[in-house]
Amino acid sequence: MERAAPSRRVPLPLLLLGGLALLAAGVDADVLLEACCADGHRMATHQKDCSLPYATESKECRMVQEQCCHSQLEELHCATGISLANEQDRCATPHGDNASLEATFVKRCCHCCLLGRAAQAQGQSCEYSLMVGYQCGQVFQACCVKSQETGDLDVGGLQETDKIIEVEEEQEDPYLNDRCRGGGPCKQQCRDTGDEVVCSCFVGYQLLSDGVSCEDVNECITGSHSCRLGESCINTVGSFRCQRDSSCGTGYELTEDNSCKDIDECESGIHNCLPDFICQNTLGSFRCRPKLQCKSGFIQDALGNCIDINECLSISAPCPIGHTCINTEGSYTCQKNVPNCGRGYHLNEEGTRCVDVDECAPPAEPCGKGHRCVNSPGSFRCECKTGYYFDGISRMCVDVNECQRYPGRLCGHKCENTLGSYLCSCSVGFRLSVDGRSCEDINECSSSPCSQECANVYGSYQCYCRRGYQLSDVDGVTCEDIDECALPTGGHICSYRCINIPGSFQCSCPSSGYRLAPNGRNCQDIDECVTGIHNCSINETCFNIQGGFRCLAFECPENYRRSAATLQQEKTDTVRCIKSCRPNDVTCVFDPVHTISHTVISLPTFREFTRPEEIIFLRAITPPHPASQANIIFDITEGNLRDSFDIIKRYMDGMTVGVVRQVRPIVGPFHAVLKLEMNYVVGGVVSHRNVVNVHIFVSEYWF
């Protein structure tokens, strides 16, 4: 039975003891279980050890203290595991990878948190479906949600890339808000449905009207007991027991432990054996065994007298066949019978009866060739053998050609006539069945005729090969390796280089700057700047490019200073310089160039073009076409080798955007610096100019 409990917050230690509080009821009313639980929490928090002795004489209080201490320790260890996953991104505990209880809980929560972070990184849902347990599922969901981030990158007053950085939002851990955590407000069992907390009771208890407490069910009154007929039901706390209320029956007596014990009538002297008999006890009764033993051929009657046994009646077939049994005092004799036989019969070997003479038995041939002798009681007759018929003209038995007389009805495949019979045979790929007429398919695959896989078909078999192999055109049974790298699609199997191996293939990547992706086919760029394997000096900035890295040092020109937004960053793809004129420097003040930025972009080799490739976005800080607003003009002033790039103006999300596009293929390795200008023109005069130097590195590979 379940009822919804009042939706109210209860201190966590009391939730953990919803079931344990029942143990104390009626045992020691002076013991305050809440205080015992608080002691257990303090021991876990300060001592980190639940095995220390508890200063109490109450068994129930010690049980509560131990359970609350272990519960608090589990929460502390789980919080440590979540911190390891978020801060170190690995689950190596300070105590090493041991099998202690602390390390087990720390590692479990750490692994569950890493799974949640990995699910978010792979774009999967944070609503977990793995059967990993309730606590692990809550940690999984919390870490998955917390690892989402948002953000954006500005280049001066522009936004020169379309990268998005997500700002982490603080979310409350749903596991900490579980109202059934530790037992909830319920005294025995608790279930949080989301809308409310539902309490229920153990077997043998029922829920009270307060929806929280439980009371014992009297099964003896409600009739829910299982006592059998002849037993009385006695109620106990949470259950019941059955007690026998009738006697055990004749020959048994009831013991103190409600069981039946055999009565030894011989020892107690309550038997009725006569003086010439000895009493022998049995289970539930007794037996009277006579003292006098009779000789062979005699049996004792009820009074102990020896009387003769008639073996001719009591024994089944006491004499051999052909003999008659005659009873004697204490024994019997057998007398032989001598019968007289007529014509066509003779006495059997035992001489007991007459049997038929088989005139047809070899080597006698009373009927001659082509005929069959048929014996009959006291005589015989001659007829044609099976497979022959009697020719009235020649007066002889002639062979029957069954194959011609019954075409297609005798054999499954082929029929061959023989003298007096016929033989059936089968085509290739079949064998004769047990009936000698039907043909059944031969499973040629049982003899392994193929080099790899074999499929039995009706009357034959077919060889086929495993993945990565093909059947030989020469013998049709040998499997030859398929060179996947030489197939028309082989160039697209691997992103760099394909290596054929027996039954499969392997992909490889350039010797440096790349590693093979988990799918075993694509090559992934190694970010040397992130992994720390670059050799850039302290005055240089490491920029990752496809297949390598570059160490670059950008200095602001005279009358310009480094932007504070990029000055404090340890790693960025953009360096921005803002104009900072000295006092009374009129030339500097009237110079329209306000910002000079350097940014780095890495591109693969585009060997074929179907449409221009958009690579850089310059976003203006003012909305398009406001009243009395400057006209924004984008231009490439330097570094556009062979006009491989162009820039167009576009309006996106209410902003004016300059889009740099690659319009011609470039085969790497290639390095160029594009100088981009964004001019604010008012009345035909440039009032404001931002300069962006884009360092373009083109890889020699297309990936």
Swiss-Prot record:
Residues forming the EGF-like domain are: 176-215, 216-261, 262-307, 308-355, 356-398, 399-440, 441-480, 481-524, 525-578
Point out the glycosylated residues in this chain: 98, 535, 539
Q: Which cellular component, as a GO term, is one annotated location?
A: elastic fiber
Coiled coil regions in record: none
Spans annotated as Self-association and FN1-binding: 356-440
What subcellular compartments does it reside in? Secreted, Extracellular space, Extracellular matrix
- Name one process (GO BP) from the record: negative regulation of cell motility
Q: Which GO terms describe its molecular function?
A: calcium ion binding; extracellular matrix structural constituent; fibrinogen binding; fibronectin binding; identical protein binding; integrin binding; peptidase activator activity; protein-containing complex binding
Name which cysteines form disulfide bonds. Answer: 36-61, 37-68, 50-69, 78-109, 91-110, 112-136, 113-143, 126-144, 180-190, 186-199, 201-214, 220-233, 227-242, 248-260, 266-279, 273-288, 294-306, 312-325, 319-334, 341-354, 360-373, 367-382, 384-397, 403-415, 411-424, 426-439, 445-454, 450-463, 465-479, 485-498, 494-507, 509-523, 529-542, 536-551, 556-577
Instruction: Please report the organism this UniProt entry assigns to the protein.
Output: Homo sapiens
Q: What induces it?
A: Expression increased by estrogen in ovarian cancer cells.
Q: Which family does it belong to?
A: Belongs to the fibulin family.
Tissue pattern of expression reads:
Isoform A and isoform B are only expressed in placenta. Isoform C and isoform D are expressed in a variety of tissues and cultured cells.
Q: Where is the Anaphylatoxin-like domain?
A: 36-76, 77-111, 112-144
Q: Tell me, how does this one assemble?
A: Homomultimerizes and interacts with various extracellular matrix components such as FN1, LAMA1, LAMA2, NID, ACAN, CSPG2 and type IV collagen. Also interacts with APP and FGB. Interacts with FBLN7. Interacts with CCN3. (Microbial infection) Interacts with human papillomavirus/HPV type 16, 18 and 31 proteins E6.
Disease implicated: A chromosomal aberration involving FBLN1 is found in a complex type of synpolydactyly referred to as 3/3-prime/4 synpolydactyly associated with metacarpal and metatarsal synostoses. Reciprocal translocation t(12;22)(p11.2;q13.3) with RASSF8. Fibroblasts derived from a patient with synpolydactyly displayed alterations in the level of isoform D splice variant incorporated into the ECM and secreted into the conditioned culture medium. By contrast, the expression of isoform C was not perturbed in the patients fibroblasts. Elevated expression and altered processing of FBLN1 protein is associated with human breast cancer.
Protein's UniProt name:
Fibulin-1
- What InterPro entries does the entry give? Anaphylatoxin/fibulin, cEGF, EGF-like_Ca-bd_dom, EGF-like_dom, EGF-type_Asp/Asn_hydroxyl_site, EGF_Ca-bd_CS, Fibulin-1, Fibulin_C
